[in-house]
Amino acid sequence: MTVRLREKYYKEVVPALMEEFKFKSIMQVPRLVKIVVNVGVGEAVQNAKAIEAAVNDVAAITGQKPVVTRAKKSVASFKLRAGMPIGVMVTLRGDRMYDFLDRLCSLALPRIRDFRGVSRSSFDGRGNYSIGLKEQIVFPDIDYDKIDKIRGLEVAIVTSAPNDEQAYSLLKRLGMPFRD
């Protein structure tokens, strides 16, 4: 099974980036390293079933079983003790990463209400891009009738680009709908 976005990267994006940035070697061309999807589940302190629902949602969206993240410190004002489950996250690499990015750009983002494109200011200065989604139901993998609560999720796209300009060019050519 070949992933559509990976083929596009090697056939179209790599030659275009080599020409644009005048790279001498193909190994200098920025590439996707990993995508991290994180869901913070604050209500898990009172409701233990919320973590299970978040695990199922993230597994359906990404195709990979997420790991449960736990609190590092106790915070009395949040009624939180160290070691309590407070979120779920999954790190995608390889084919699953390209497949997820393809579905994010072509299916999920256009389904957001009043969507005009993602912001260019969400780069971190080192070539990585972060985006937050307010609801998980924009993914077609989630059945609206089976969710217990609308949760947001954060998506961090890590690239090998040394700066934001190269990362922007890479993501733009891969199909990320930026607001210009």
From Swiss-Prot:
InterPro entries assigned: Ribosomal_uL5, Ribosomal_uL5_bac-type, Ribosomal_uL5_C, Ribosomal_uL5_CS, Ribosomal_uL5_dom_sf, Ribosomal_uL5_N
Keyword tRNA-binding part of the UniProt annotation: yes
PROSITE patterns, per database record: RIBOSOMAL_L5 (PS00358)
Keyword vocabulary terms for this entry: Ribonucleoprotein, Ribosomal protein, RNA-binding, rRNA-binding, tRNA-binding
Cellular component GO terms held in the UniProt record: ribonucleoprotein complex; ribosome
SUBUNIT field: Part of the 50S ribosomal subunit; part of the 5S rRNA/L5/L18/L25 subcomplex. Contacts the 5S rRNA and the P site tRNA. Forms a bridge to the 30S subunit in the 70S ribosome.
Protein name: Large ribosomal subunit protein uL5
